[in-house]
């Protein structure tokens, strides 16, 4: 009854109006699962391949008909007949069918869509929530949200090199209250921006993209908004995080961090040592608890030096650096680079490999942050993954745009379903830092 009988993919649109995949999996019993695949704007060079058609006459070359065809005519034939509950076997079969180290033959987007749909169909068959199916009955930790309320870098037209400025309600008593705190700060920030005559249009992830005078101006305006909303900027209230996305402005030939790419003529150009000094200066000055991709994805010496300097005080998250890949994570653990990994399901391409990366991180004392992509859909699977793994942190955008809110609303539902069992750790989610 739990045998897969049909697999079907179609092309749909993501939050940027670009094509992506939606996959449906059906079983003998009538159980059904659907998965939708996100897409990134700033991508690590070591990520699994997102297969696009390349036909410029259709969707500007970004069509996904090849990936759809791979699901309907290649993957479907291979996994029909499998027990939908055997996630690992199905994921391994797809990996073997692809046969490349980066899923470049079938496309990680094709494989991931099936992987998510299979998990959802299995949960439907067993009549349990997805987070329970994926994580068992010890799933109880609601994640501390990283709310990206200022967008810069490749996510907006704002002249700021850092890609994301986030708020984290570490002092909130519950996820529900933390979400409320974040929403109130978001609206306070909008009011402040309007009063300054700055643009309040939002970027890809729902954050504002105003023309600030620089990074410090952005941070200080966020602190002003936190206080205007009635909260404390610090450990007892709301802290701040960055996604520097440094690979986006690292000049490989000159081996410098060239802020002029986003901030224009006269902006800083920093060596690795100067980049670390600058990040430390920001940490000393502001209530910052997490920095993502503070160094370029291939600047291993820089990462190790940054971790040695700040790794006990601040969460140092590897996104482009690790690309949710256990090979890169294992090297980072061995060499003492970073202390946290960003988890993006489409960077690696299957739920099995995603969970392996989270498990490896936790065993090494690294934190794991479950994350969206800038091109999202209404699919809320990452909310369930965050709870299923007791990850303790989620990064899924600002307090606007339905593609972001869908994940927050799913977490509210999960918190309600868990009732008194639900745990919101807040500041304690950063368990590897010295308090």
Curated annotation (Swiss-Prot):
Cofactor(s) annotated in UniProt: Mg(2+)
Protein name in the entry: Enolase
Organism: Streptococcus suis (strain 98HAH33)
Catalyzed reactions per annotation: (2R)-2-phosphoglycerate = phosphoenolpyruvate + H2O
Note accompanying the cofactor annotation: Binds a second Mg(2+) ion via substrate during catalysis.
Active-site residues per Swiss-Prot or TrEMBL entry: 205 (proton donor), 344 (proton acceptor)
GO CC terms in record: cell surface; extracellular region; peptidoglycan-based cell wall; phosphopyruvate hydratase complex
Binding locations of (2R)-2-phosphoglycerate: 163, 344, 373-374, 395
Gene Ontology terms, MF aspect: magnesium ion binding; phosphopyruvate hydratase activity
Entry binding sites for Mg(2+): 243, 292, 319
CDD domains found in the cross-reference section: enolase
Assigned protein family: Belongs to the enolase family.
Pathway involvement of the protein, from the record: Carbohydrate degradation; glycolysis; pyruvate from D-glyceraldehyde 3-phosphate: step 4/5
Domain of life, per lineage: Bacteria
Record's subcellular location: Cytoplasm; Secreted; Cell surface
HAMAP family named among the record's database cross-references: Enolase (MF_00318)
């Amino acid at each position: 009854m739990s045998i897969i009988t049909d697999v079907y993919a179609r092309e749909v649109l993501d939050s940027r109006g670009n094509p992506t995949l939606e996959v449906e999996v059906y079983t003998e019993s009538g159980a059904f699962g659907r998965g939708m695949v996100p897409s990134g704007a700033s991508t690590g060079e070591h990520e699994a391949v997102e297969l696009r058609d390349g036909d410029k006459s259709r969707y500007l070359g970004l069509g996904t008909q090849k990936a759809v065809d791979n699901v309907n005519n290649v993957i479907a034939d291979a996994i029909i007949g499998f027990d939908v509950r055997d996630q690992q076997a199905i994921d391994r079969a797809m990996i073997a069918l692809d046969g490349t180290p980066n899923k470049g033959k079938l496309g990680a987007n094709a494989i991931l869509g099936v992987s998510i749909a299979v998990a959802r169909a299995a949960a439907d068959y067993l009549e349990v929530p997805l987070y329970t199916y994926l994580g068992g009955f010890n799933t109880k930790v609601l994640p501390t949200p990283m709310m990206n309320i200022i967008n810069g870098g490749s996510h907006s037209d704002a002249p700021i090199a850092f890609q994301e400025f986030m708020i984290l309600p570490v002092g909130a008593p519950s996820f529900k209250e933390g979400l409320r705190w974040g929403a109130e700060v978001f609206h306070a920030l909008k009011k402040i921006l309007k009063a300054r005559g700055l643009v309040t249009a939002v970027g890809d992830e729902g954050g504002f993209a105003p023309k600030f005078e620089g990074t410090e101006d952005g941070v200080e305006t966020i602190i002003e908004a936190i206080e205007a909303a009635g909260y404390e900027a610090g450990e007892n209230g709301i802290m701040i995080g960055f996604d520097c996305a440094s690979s986006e402005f690292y000049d490989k030939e000159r081996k410098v961090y060239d802020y002029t790419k986003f901030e224009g003529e006269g902006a800083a150009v920093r060596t690795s040592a100067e980049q670390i000094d600058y990040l430390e200066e920001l940490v000393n000055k502001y209530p910052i608890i997490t920095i993502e991709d503070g160094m370029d994805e291939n600047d291993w010496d820089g990462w190790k030096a940054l971790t040695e300097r700040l790794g006990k005080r601040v969460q140092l998250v590897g996104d482009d650096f690790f690309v949710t890949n256990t090979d890169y994570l294992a090297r980072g653990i061995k060499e003492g680079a970073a202390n946290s990994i960003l988890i993006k399901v489409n960077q690696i391409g299957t739920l099995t490999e995603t969970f392996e990366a989270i498990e490896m991180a936790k065993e090494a004392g690294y934190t794991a942050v479950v994350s969206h992509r800038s091109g999202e859909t209404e699919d809320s699977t990452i909310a369930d993954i965050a709870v299923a793994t007791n990850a303790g942190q989620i990064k899924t955008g600002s307090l606007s745009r339905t593609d972001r809110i869908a994940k927050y609303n799913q977490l509210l539902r999960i918190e309600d379903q868990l009732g008194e069992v639900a745990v919101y750790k807040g500041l304690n989610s950063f368990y590897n830092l010295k308090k």
